[in-house]
């Protein structure tokens, strides 16, 4: 899904680093997969992949399955991880993450 945007080896390393429940850290993950250093356009492409229902927002249920966008058999995030991730990205408090919020979160 991220072909041409991210490197497979980087994705594998990032997923390996957060395999254990409650070990997911969005900043570390974005850095490891190489998203932090990507152009705004590439970050928007990543957003479009994660926004599975194409609503223009990443909702809590999509965040829970965030890792599965990178590898189909990756684990779901725990409720705690999902809520922390949402809180970090949802700067306007509407309960979901828009593309500008996502870009800011990746680049933070």
UniProtKB/Swiss-Prot annotation:
Per UniProt, residues of the EF-hand domain are 38-73, 77-108
Q: One Gene Ontology cellular component annotation?
A: cytoplasm
> Which InterPro entries does this chain map to?
EF-hand-dom_pair, EF_Hand_1_Ca_BS, EF_hand_dom, Parvalbumin
- Quote the SMART domains the UniProt record gives: EFh
* Keyword Acetylation annotated: yes
| Residues with N-acetylalanine modification | 1
Keywords (alphabetical) are: Acetylation, Calcium, Metal-binding, Muscle protein, Repeat
| Residues that bind Ca(2+) 2 | 90, 92, 94, 96, 101
In the UniProt record, does the keyword Calcium occur? yes
- CDD domains of this UniProt entry? EFh_parvalbumin_beta (cd16255)
Q: What are this entry's molecular-function GO terms?
A: calcium ion binding
Enumerate the SUPFAM superfamilies for this protein.
EF-hand
Anything else known: This parvalbumin has an isoelectric point of 4.25.
Q: Which PANTHER family match?
A: PARVALBUMIN (PTHR11653:SF12), PARVALBUMIN ALPHA (PTHR11653)
Q: What does this protein do?
A: In muscle, parvalbumin is thought to be involved in relaxation after contraction. It binds two calcium ions.
State the family named in the UniProt similarity comment for this chain.
Belongs to the parvalbumin family.
What's the protein name?
Parvalbumin beta
Traced from the root, the source organism's taxonomic lineage reads: Eukaryota, Metazoa, Chordata, Craniata, Vertebrata
């Amino acid at each position: 899904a991220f072909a041409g945007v991210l490197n497979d080896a980087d994705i594998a390393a990032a997923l390996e680093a957060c395999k254990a429940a409650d070990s997911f850290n969005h900043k570390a993950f974005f850095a490891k997969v190489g998203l932090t250093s990507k152009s705004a356009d590439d970050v928007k492409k990543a957003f479009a992949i994660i926004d599975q229902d194409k609503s223009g927002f990443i909702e809590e249920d999509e965040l829970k399955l965030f890792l599965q966008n990178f590898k189909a058999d990756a684990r779901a995030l725990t409720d705690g991880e999902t809520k922390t991730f949402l809180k970090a990205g949802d700067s306007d408090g509407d309960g979901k993450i828009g593309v500008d919020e996502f870009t800011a979160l990746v680049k933070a």
